[in-house]
Amino acid sequence: MAMNIRKIHPLLKIMNQTLIDLPAPSNISIWWNFGSLLGLCLVIQIVTGLFLAMHYTADITMAFSSVTHICRDVNYGWLIRNIHANGASLFFVCIYFHIARGLYYGSYLYKETWNIGVILLFLLMATAFVGYVLPWGQMSFWGATVITNLLSAFPYIGDTLVQWIWGGFSVDNATLTRFFAFHFLLPFLITALMIIHILFLHETGSNNPMGLNSDMDKISFHPYFIYKDALGFLSLLILLGILALFLPNLLGDTENFIPANPLVTPPHIKPEWYFLFAYAILRSIPNKLGGVLALLFSILILMLVPFLHTSKQRSSTFRPLTQVFFWILVANMLVLTWIGGQPVEQPFILIGQIASISYFSLFLIAIPLAGWWENKILGLN
């Protein structure tokens, strides 16, 4: 009997081992859907982005007009743009759920997979930031000015670094051109890293809600998880359709409908909603360099999580105290997101400072202590 071609063909064999005959734990829940949803988001963003790039002009005199032209004159240009803009929001929703799943169920103990995931988050944030500058509206321009100017806080090299990124002495045409180049390039770098992320994951196999070894209880990825992922795909596409068709500007900033004007500062400069938690941490520290470092460590702290794991159990499923701290962390993130969108005045300054201290304390002190205490209670030392 002839061997199935998908099992012997050099290229199809790799696809088969990744998507068809992959042994997967039988008990993984819906929280394991977000990895494949991130892949779908990436494909949607690359395809819509490619079509937008065909009509976009990276020049400060024409960028805003070219986006208007896409929405008014290009066939279904309005739809492509709305899908691309709201697809970015859903990308971040999926990645935040994906990270939260990893934190809750102890997936971070696969260190290589986890660290590449953190690098992917950095790249995704960089891509979204440079992409937000491209329409060249008021918030695009001032957001780019404020965020890039933070680099000047670094001693000695700061000012030179900022001018190097700007390509001059202010955010200008050179800045827009290079940001467009970066925005085009980075998604392909993300794709490459995503493949490496999956490669490392398949070295160890997937984690599961129990946090136990599931080698004795695995099922093939196809058809079981293909259908389960298909349900997630359908749900995401319906949500994206509702956003793009009915509420396209819900998550955007109205300031960005005004063309960029270096002489008029918007009343409140703020990034897109998915950066607000980090922006709140940045603003909560009065010192410029301190704020920049806090902003950086708000993401880099994820790389420390595997080393701060003190519990003898991997997952939080049977650890009630850790669960409490996890949900406090989630609530804390939501508070930071809210504060990031508020003006810099009392009581928002104080709430932001308390939430920022809580954010780092939960990662560095509360959750490791909870793990240690649970070991004591259960006599697992």
From Swiss-Prot:
The cytochrome bc1 complex contains 3 respiratory subunits (MT-CYB, CYC1 and UQCRFS1), 2 core proteins (UQCRC1 and UQCRC2) and probably 6 low-molecular weight proteins. Its cofactor is heme b. InterPro entries: Cyt_b/b6_C (IPR005798), Cyt_b/b6_C_sf (IPR036150), Cyt_b/b6_N (IPR005797), Cytb/b6-like_sf (IPR027387), Cytochrome_b (IPR030689), Cytochrome_b_C_euk/bac (IPR048260), Cytochrome_b_N_euk/bac (IPR048259), Di-haem_cyt_TM (IPR016174). Belongs to the cytochrome b family. It holds the Pfam family Cytochrom_B_C. It is found in: Mitochondrion inner membrane. A ubiquinone binds at residue 202. Keywords: Electron transport, Heme, Iron, Membrane, Metal-binding, Mitochondrion, Mitochondrion inner membrane, Respiratory chain, Transmembrane, Transmembrane helix, Transport, Ubiquinone. PROSITE patterns: CYTB_CTER (PS51003), CYTB_NTER (PS51002). GO terms for cellular component: mitochondrial inner membrane; respiratory chain complex III. Binds 2 heme b groups non-covalently. It is a multi-pass membrane protein. Heme 1 (or BL or b562) is low-potential and absorbs at about 562 nm, and heme 2 (or BH or b566) is high-potential and absorbs at about 566 nm. Component of the ubiquinol-cytochrome c reductase complex (complex III or cytochrome b-c1 complex) that is part of the mitochondrial respiratory chain. The b-c1 complex mediates electron transfer from ubiquinol to cytochrome c. Contributes to the generation of a proton gradient across the mitochondrial membrane that is then used for ATP synthesis. The chain crosses the membrane at residues 34-54, 78-99, 114-134, 179-199, 227-247, 289-309, 321-341, 348-368. CDD domains: cytochrome_b_C (cd00290), Cytochrome_b_N (cd00284). GO terms for molecular function: metal ion binding; ubiquinol-cytochrome-c reductase activity. Heme b b562 binds at residues 84, 183. This is Cytochrome b. Heme b b566 binds at residues 98, 197. The keyword Iron applies. One of its GO terms (biological process) is mitochondrial electron transport, ubiquinol to cytochrome c.
